């Protein structure tokens, strides 16, 4: 029973942190004092569940990684057409971002500016993993469909992911007014026409 309460409290702390990142407070540095107040516990109680604020952010990063990478793997298992795979992966990231604005502050690096460098490295590693997946999808086109792209797969993957990162940054910069999926179909039509 105590383990379940501890697990629930950990989740409650992470949810409160994500909510704070989504609010106007997320535009500035979040302190453990503010977070403890939001959760309704003492600052010491936070540290019973997490040894540091960096570990709290790591908990959210782990959630982001698991959510995105597991869904990307599902896309790769279920879809075989290269362009459709790419479209679904890009759309997945944008939809995830739109549904989780507070977590988008982490993905964009905005929430991590004044935090431990290790956290920024984790986000960079996540984007490198996604870019590697995109490169692999692009390379497999030659094997699956007998077609290649007019541009090197490495350059193309970086460009595709860069477009997504730009949408995430715009979403954060606008205080979540410009939805990442807004005009996605037109955006995809433009991109896919260039890489067919």
UniProtKB/Swiss-Prot annotation:
The gene is slmA. Belongs to the nucleoid occlusion factor SlmA family. GO terms for biological process: cell division; negative regulation of division septum assembly. SUPFAM superfamilies: Homeodomain-like (SSF46689), Tetracyclin repressor-like, C-terminal domain (SSF48498). Residues 31-50 bind DNA. Pfam families: SlmA-like_C, TetR_N. The keyword Cell membrane does not apply. InterPro entries: Homeodomain-like_sf (IPR009057), HTH-type_TetR-like_transc_reg (IPR050109), HTH_TetR (IPR001647), NO_SlmA (IPR023769), SlmA-like_C (IPR054580), Tet_transcr_reg_TetR-rel_C_sf (IPR036271). Residues 65-142 form a coiled coil. PROSITE patterns: HTH_TETR_2. GO terms for cellular component: bacterial nucleoid; cytoplasm. Required for nucleoid occlusion (NO) phenomenon, which prevents Z-ring formation and cell division over the nucleoid. Acts as a DNA-associated cell division inhibitor that binds simultaneously chromosomal DNA and FtsZ, and disrupts the assembly of FtsZ polymers. SlmA-DNA-binding sequences (SBS) are dispersed on non-Ter regions of the chromosome, preventing FtsZ polymerization at these regions. This is Nucleoid occlusion factor SlmA. The lineage of its organism: Bacteria, Pseudomonadati, Pseudomonadota, Gammaproteobacteria, Vibrionales. Keywords: Cell cycle, Cell division, Coiled coil, Cytoplasm, DNA-binding. Residues 7-68 form the HTH tetR-type domain. Gene3D superfamilies: Tetracycline Repressor, domain 2. Homodimer. Interacts with FtsZ. GO terms for molecular function: DNA-binding transcription factor activity; transcription cis-regulatory region binding. It comes from the Bacteria.
């Amino acid at each position: 029973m105590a383990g379940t309460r501890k697990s629930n409290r950990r989740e409650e702390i992470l949810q409160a942190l994500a909510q704070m990142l989504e609010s106007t407070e997320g535009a500035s540095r979040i302190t453990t004092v503010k977070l403890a107040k939001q959760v309704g516990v003492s600052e010491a109680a936070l540290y019973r569940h997490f040894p540091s604020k960096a570990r709290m952010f790591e908990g959210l990063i782990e959630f982001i990684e698991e959510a995105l990478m597991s869904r990307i793997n599902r896309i790769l298992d279920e879809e075989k057409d290269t362009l459709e795979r790419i479209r679904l992966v890009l759309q997945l990231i944008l939809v995830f971002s739109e549904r989780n604005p507070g977590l988008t502050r982490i993905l964009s690096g905005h929430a991590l500016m004044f935090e431990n460098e290790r956290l920024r490295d984790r986000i960079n590693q996540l984007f490198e993993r996604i870019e590697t997946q995109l490169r692999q999808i692009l390379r497999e086109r030659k094997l699956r469909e007998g077609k290649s792209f007019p541009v090197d797969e490495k350059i193309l993957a970086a460009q595709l992911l860069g477009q997504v990162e730009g949408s995430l940054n715009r979403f954060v910069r606008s205080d979540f007014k410009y939805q990442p999926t807004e005009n996605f179909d037109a955006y995809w039509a433009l991109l896919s026409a260039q890489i067919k």
